[in-house]
């Protein structure tokens, strides 16, 4: 796709940006498998006990949970880690002395679902909170 988008095969034993991939196996399994199951359980409990979510918020929560479950299934099914395969070129981002980024870290559809739905949920909560207080939040 002209170098902007590449399909690659990367096994990621960590989480976003491969954070934690150098941790011991038992610690990784707890942090990246057991803990997410607990968090998903809590999200489900809140989701089904709360009747104040808008339809958009409910869809966003489903997208987050679906992405999380997709990554968990991949993590349990593959000892070598979650498969990431979408590699996107971005304009060079650099903060002198801190970091530079020439390509976005490789990700998968579940990651995209989680990130996009989290953004939708945050904006939706901000709009809902602004509407309840009688004003719109700045910039929205």
What are these regions (language model features)?
Residues 1-140:
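Alpha-helical transmembrane bundles and membrane-interface segments of multipass inner-membrane proteins
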């Amino acid at each position: 796709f002209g170098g902007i988008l590449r399909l690659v095969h990367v096994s990621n034993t960590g989480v976003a940006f491969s954070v934690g991939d150098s941790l011991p196996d038992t610690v990784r399994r707890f942090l990246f498998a057991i803990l997410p199951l607990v968090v998903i359980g809590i999200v489900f409990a809140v989701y089904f006990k709360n009747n104040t979510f808008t339809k958009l918020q409910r869809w966003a929560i489903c997208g987050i949970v679906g992405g999380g479950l997709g990554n968990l299934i991949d993590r349990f099914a593959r000892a070598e880690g979650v498969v990431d395969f979408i590699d996107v070129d971005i304009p060079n981002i650099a903060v002198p002395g801190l970091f530079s980024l020439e390509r976005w870290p490789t990700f998968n559809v579940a990651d995209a679902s989680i990130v996009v739905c989290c953004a939708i949920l945050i904006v939706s909560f901000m709009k809902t909170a602004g509407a309840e207080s009688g004003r719109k939040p700045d910039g929205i």
